[in-house]
Curated annotation (Swiss-Prot):
One of its GO terms (molecular function) is toxin activity. Its main location: secreted. This is Cupiennin-6a. The lineage of its organism: Eukaryota, Metazoa, Ecdysozoa, Arthropoda, Chelicerata. The modification Serine amide is found at residue 21. Keywords: Amidation, Secreted, Toxin. Belongs to the cationic peptide 04 (cupiennin) family. 09 subfamily. It comes from the Eukaryota. The keyword Secreted applies. One of its GO terms (cellular component) is extracellular region. It is found in: Secreted. Expressed by the venom gland.
């Protein structure tokens, strides 16, 4: 369960970084 949340956060963070660029 925690692994899934961490993966989701990582993906969201990467998305934010890509959108911010």
């Amino acid at each position: 369960f925690v692994n899934t949340i961490r993966l989701l956060i990582n993906k969201a963070r990467e998305w934010n970084n890509k959108q911010s660029s």
